[in-house]
Design a protein with these regions (language model features):
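Hydrophobic core of transmembrane alpha-helices in multi-pass small-molecule transporters
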Residues: 9-25, 204-218
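Cytoplasmic helix-loop-helix junction between adjacent transmembrane helices
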Residues: 16-52
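Transmembrane alpha-helix termini and helix-breaking/packing motifs in multi-pass membrane transporters
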Residues: 2-3, 57-78, 138-139, 143, ...
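Glycine-rich segments within core transmembrane alpha-helices of 12-TM secondary carriers
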Residues: 46-62, 246-254
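C-terminal membrane-cytosol helix-exit motif in multi-pass small-molecule transporters
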Residues: 64, 83-102, 280-288
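C-terminal ends and interior cores of transmembrane alpha-helices
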Residues: 1-7, 188-201, 285
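Helix-to-loop junctions at the C-terminal end of transmembrane segments
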Residues: 68, 166-179, 262-263
Length: 309
């Protein structure tokens, strides 16, 4: 469909449709993953899913390059072929998987619980940091260091390759050391990375920071597995939607606000990122050694009845 609307407003229209579908898919994927996976295997399997997604991205990038460079395929043809494949897969999935098994009946209404407050906070801060990386780190590569489209694409490919090779191992690490230690490692590393972004003057070093930055984000699996351990099984579907909404509060506000800061100081934008990482580090220390219902944070006791809230 996108290939038939090669205009500015056509791109806006098709992007909104794509965004609706993407976020619906991501919410369903998170909900089903946390419902179906056992708690002890969830970190590794979630890491494996990231690795599979990265392999798929590498494959699609390679095919697009092949069609464009070898066959000189137009944008219209590329979009038609890609859309046709996606439509075919959707029809196949609808025929062979007409419904999904629910291990527990899911709440059909929006669920907000006081005992999930730490999860909500970590999700919000994660969204803020993520937007600084997605929007401004790539922008830094182009504006300050003059990276070309092909060079930025190469960075994307390196990131996908890293996830392919190591995401499952990172999931295993989270399962072994626990969510608090894993998130502590992530946020400590991100503080240094964001500060380095603000100071870097070398293009190669900036590219290394970009890859390291992406590497640390794989540890964010720990937020999902922390929630799986403390949540009522009936809340998985509703809370997936809530978490995406909370995450995107930052996604709407941060790029606009820090875009104004960017015009004045590139470095200050990344220092804000370091501040968000520091706040995340502080918040992550409230995750108990063994999180569970009734023991959601270090501020609650394991035998508390607060999980009813």
């Amino acid at each position: 469909m996108t290939g038939f609307f090669p205009t500015e407003y056509g791109l806006y229209f098709t992007t909104v449709i794509m965004s609706i579908g993407f976020h619906y898919f991501e919410a369903v994927k998170q909900s089903l993953s946390l419902q179906w996976l056992k708690k002890e295997e969830a970190p590794q399997i979630l890491g494996r899913l990231i690795a599979i997604g990265s392999v798929t991205s590498l494959t699609v990038y390679s095919l697009l390059w092949f069609f464009i460079e070898v066959f000189q395929a137009s944008f219209l043809i590329n979009f038609l072929v890609s859309g046709g494949i996606c439509l075919g897969l959707a029809i196949f999935m609808g025929m062979y998987f007409p419904s999904f098994e629910e291990k527990s009946q899911q709440n059909k209404s929006i669920v907000l619980r006081k005992r999930y407050w730490l999860y909500y906070l970590l999700t919000f801060l994660s969204g803020a940091r993520r937007q600084i990386f997605v929007v401004f780190a790539a922008f830094l590569m182009v504006e300050k260091f003059g990276y070309s489209v092909s060079e930025v694409t190469l960075l994307f490919l390196v990131n996908y390759a890293f996830n392919w090779l190591f995401a499952e191992k990172i999931g295993q690490l989270i399962g072994r050391i626990g969510e608090r230690r894993a998130l502590t490692l992530e946020y400590t590393g991100l503080i240094f990375v964001f500060v380095a972004y603000g100071l870097v003057e070398n293009a190669t070093l900036a590219a290394c920071l970009y890859v390291i930055d992406h590497m640390f984000f794989a540890l964010a699996i720990g937020i999902k597995t922390y929630f799986q351990k403390i949540a009522d099984p009936a809340d998985m579907a509703s809370s997936a939607g809530v978490s995406f909404t909370i995450n995107h509060i930052a996604a709407v506000v941060i790029p606009a606000a820090l875009g104004l800061v960017w015009l004045w100081s590139h470095a200050l934008v990344f220092y804000f990122g370091a501040m968000f990482a520091l706040l995340s580090l502080i918040a992550s220390q409230l995750i108990p050694r063994d999180p569970m219902r009734g023991n959601e944070t270090n501020l609650t006791s394991a035998n508390s009845l607060g999980y009813q809230a």
